[in-house]
Amino acid sequence: MGRLAGKIAFITGAARGQGRSHAVCMAEEGADVIISDICGPVGTSGVAPATPEDLAETVRLVEATGRRVIWDRVDVREPEALKALAQRGIDELGYITTVVANAGILNWSRTHELTQTQWQDVIDVNLTGTFNTVQAVLPHFLERGQGGSFIVISSAAGLKGQPFTLGYTSAKHGLVGMVNALAIEYGEYNIRANSIHQAGVTTPMGDVPGLGELIGERAFTVGPVFMNTMPVEMLEPIDVSNAVVYLASDEARYVTGLQMKIDAGLVGR
């Protein structure tokens, strides 16, 4: 029996990258999943968007594990669409035990050149989108009365200053406050909330040449901020998914309000 037998997870941003890895790894451990992704451009994001074909591939990979999967194209900036997908999952699968708030975007700029639109796009997706995701499932956790687990994918940038990504860094710091507030407010209901803070990961979002150019031009002054202390340049998605599986499992039943670093020493610099 897998570590997540009996669990049903609601996962955003699951078309590719970390989100796909989380969905497949959770399914391999016995969870059924409800997955979503916008599968299209998001404002000023500097990363090429996921596609409907990407989401279909995630569905295929989950189904190959033998687990059930419900999916739809959903923008986390649209709370009613998130609520509708959550309710569909509850109707078809019976309940939800776990939320993995993974959807996010990244853009970059010198802060004095950052536009209002660039700022707002990242805040709307990374911070408000996570709030919308929490609100889509929290009432169900309370009504069901059997606890629940919120796993919020933040970033190393949620625990340290990261230049050239002011909106992203601000949003990811905001997620720490959100998680800690949830953990305190809803602990009495056995509802847990934790955040994960990863170093760079080998995904489309982790491969951003434009940001690399900004860093390279200032390698002496800011370069070390982006460097791991361990001898690895980038993490693999599975490194983060292993933490997700743990936090979703009963092994972590009393773990809440945690900022879990999967960072190869990055935050320590």
Give the positions of each predicted feature.
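Short, small/polar-rich loop/turn modules that mediate ligand/substrate recognition or access, typified
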Residues: 187, 192, 255-257
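Residue(s) in the substrate-gating loop at a strand-loop-helix junction
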Residues: 155
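Active-site helix of classical SDR
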Residues: 134, 171, 179
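Substrate-binding pocket helix/loop in short-chain dehydrogenase/reductase
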Residues: 110-111, 115-123
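Short C-terminal tail/terminal secondary-structure segment
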Residues: 160, 231-232, 244-245, 256-269
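Canonical Rossmann dinucleotide-binding motif of NAD(H)/NADP(H)-dependent dehydrogenases/reductases
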Residues: 2-40
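A conserved structural motif in NAD(P)-dependent oxidoreductases
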Residues: 228-240
